[in-house]
Amino acid sequence: MNKIILHAQDLDGFLTEGDKKNIESVHALYEKSLDACRRIDNDNSDCKAKDDLSASAAEIGDKLKEICSTNDRIHVYSFETPREQHGEASRIIAKLRNPETGHEEFLYYIQRAYELMFAHSFADKNLNNKRAMIQMTPVTNPCRNYAVHKIPDVDELAHSSVMCVMLRGALLPSMIISKEFQDYSSDDTITPFALFKIKRDESKKESNMDYVLDLDRSFFKLEELDGKDLIFADPMNATGGSLVTIVKYLKEHGVKPRSIKFINVISALKGALRITRVIEEAEVYTLWMDPVLNEQAYILPGLGDAGDRLNGEDKGPEPRNMIQLIADYGSNIVNLYRDQVIEIEKTVLN
């Protein structure tokens, strides 16, 4: 088997002493939240526990904002957008966290999350550089009508970007970002895809975690990534290890990216800090920041296993292949992202 392995110990050496102190301080604050969670779980009518949880969440939010303000390559949606927009982001995250949110509804809110994140990561940065889109309408009386819409011009970035997919949880989010580029571009650009089969060793704990890149089940060409804007869209950034493993491999084989963006729905503080310390050209964009990881390296409070909730669990002894994963999204998703599906199929077959 042709595999590349990165150890967690290789990542922590890049954290500064200030980073480590900040991570420890947030852990200490989150202990108050855990205490309130235990009391609520024991008695759901405990109003004092709920008030304590709300107060703890506010304290943690202020601390995370303070920490992120010192790192200009970590972008948290609710820390950088007007207050009026925070309610929508909070509602989306709450629905995704809810264990009662079913598969189709979970897909819907992931789509909403990545539409917001595309606007924040790309479109909003081009508000001063707009183009006119002339759109035909169905109205023909007294003549065929056309409407003018000014939209951010993202053509240059659309043409230079490659969607780098960390299978399997990042498959649909990457398709969503690609379609946003297509819809914003003046020439219907379909971004190319590079597919990386990577997973954590779930038998390990956060402190000694291994990240395994399976090259035999990955589909990419190094020369097509060199000098490009590499975009990774993964719902969850817990430790940052998977992204770092891939980028280190690419750089060791001569790839020099123009830029790297990691776009998440939820990022843990430690994962965001690690990425920006290890990869000098990387920027992390996240809709929400959660404070800590548990010893299994899962984000707290988190939303569970995003890969399983997006794709369903593998039932057989072998994991599903790319085409099976896409088919399991259902016809509505496949039809909506048909151009992206075709591009992914080309990547796999070639």
What are these regions (language model features)?
Residues 1-350:
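PRPP-associated nucleotide enzymes
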